[in-house]
Amino acid sequence: MKIEEMTIMDIRKGYVQKQFTVKDVVQGYIDRIKELDGKINAFITLCEESALMEAAVLDEKLSRGEEIGLLGGIPVAIKDNMCTQGIKTSCASEMLADFIPPYDATIVKKLRAAGAIIIGKTNMDEFAMGSSTENSAFKVTKNPWDLTKVPGGSSGGSAAALAAGFAPLTIGSDTGGSIRQPAAFCGTVGLKPTYGLVSRFGLIAFASSLDQIGPFTKTVKDCALSLQVMQGNDPLDSTSIQQEPMDDYVKDLDKGVKGLKVGIPKEFFQEGLNIEISDSIKEAIKVLEQLGAVVEEFSLPVTDSGLSAYYIISSAEASSNLARYDGVRYGHRAAVYEGIEEMMLNSRSEGFGKEVKRRIMLGTYVLSSGYYDAYYKKAMDFRKKTRNVFKKAFESYDVILTPTSPVLPFTIGEKTGDPLEMYLADIYTVNVNIAGVPAISIPCGFSKEKLPIGLQLIGDHYSEKKLLQAAYGLEQELGIFKEMPQQREVK
């Protein structure tokens, strides 16, 4: 089996059976990245030296018969908005181009404690604001399935790295679909956990009440194992889950979907949905029915205002969170200025890209006197309504099934001139963040042009175990993940 085809489970098994060393695996991925990432641009920083040093330590442990952890010897690539001690963390922005954090984010600490090896930091839309990874200050990431297409965003670097076989596990953040939409575009599994299940400490904030960290993997089983490591209370994040969740997500993963109640919201299958995506999702629904799931169409009236509410709330929070980047304490400082006010103005003008400025201006506007009630308050009222709508839906259904994105991966540069058209790529994902519930995107088919299509399963708060069981049952029957390693050979 080629290294780019291996799952986390394959690698763990290989270590147990002494088929290869940790150094072999890490070196194999590094060689592949060096050979092919010049075409894809998935990485901002490659951590070759430190990764090989950590691999040598783990090999020594294995030779002594010691345990190396749930993710022992698994290379992982981290989105470049999560703090990594001693490793540059830029948020793909000129503002933080030279920022080296003095500490690890909690997610990074947990991965390291489980034996994972940080292989690099991945490209993204600047400050996680975008749906195509075209807003990075440094490079445009390309979709490994078709180098003329975008990989989705904002975690496009992580999705592309996983799809290209540069790592068996990558980490992203999801504010309005930034894990699930790139997962759909790149043909991977991508999970946005329940808000609070995974600590946000050390994640550079975009919209604090919406942001959540999650994994990209090749298979649902890999995703379940990764979540096992990532989840849990963190005293450094007051919004993290208070009790320590003890769910073993891998155990009983093969429970099956017989008797599972699946809701299909009719609002997600109306005008604007690509016909090939619609057909692919409908085929997957038939498969669920054949497996014994109880499938029913129902109304989930959140799509009309969800996108508007999301962009109001997220931009408002961004304008506040990004106020700290003023050239005073850290981040970019303008070289030419007269006085403190001009220094701040010039630093922000030079440090932030066009999309970030657009959202800061929008956020400042909706929070300003005279407009707060008309926009921000209405959006927060809609948020409350959305939570209640989902709560009511989960009284009748175990999971909700929708397309992940209304469109196929689009051509690089196609939507950059029309922000509203770009924002519409998130129409099926934003409401999940507004409600704070978990959702997973899994591959469910391909277009005629062999572009991946993703299917989204949404669960109730903290129902990840049931959600992963449903995703696993469908994944195993569809068998699409088996096709992917061969397709991932980047030409």
UniProtKB/Swiss-Prot annotation:
EC number: 6.3.5.7
Residues annotated as the enzyme's active site: 79, 154, 178
Entry annotated with the keyword Iron: no
GO cellular component, one term: glutamyl-tRNA(Gln) amidotransferase complex
Source taxon at top rank: Bacteria
A GO molecular-function descriptor: glutaminyl-tRNA synthase (glutamine-hydrolyzing) activity
GO BP annotation list: translation
Class of this enzyme: ligase
InterPro entries linked: Amidase, Amidase_CS, Amidase_dom, AS_sf, GatA
Residues of the signal peptide: none
Keyword annotations from UniProtKB, A to Z: ATP-binding, Ligase, Nucleotide-binding, Protein biosynthesis
Subunit relationships: Heterotrimer of A, B and C subunits.
HAMAP family according to UniProt: GatA
Family indicated by similarity: Belongs to the amidase family. GatA subfamily.
General function of this protein: Allows the formation of correctly charged Gln-tRNA(Gln) through the transamidation of misacylated Glu-tRNA(Gln) in organisms which lack glutaminyl-tRNA synthetase. The reaction takes place in the presence of glutamine and ATP through an activated gamma-phospho-Glu-tRNA(Gln).
Official protein name in the record: Glutamyl-tRNA(Gln) amidotransferase subunit A
Gene source species: Alkaliphilus metalliredigens (strain QYMF)
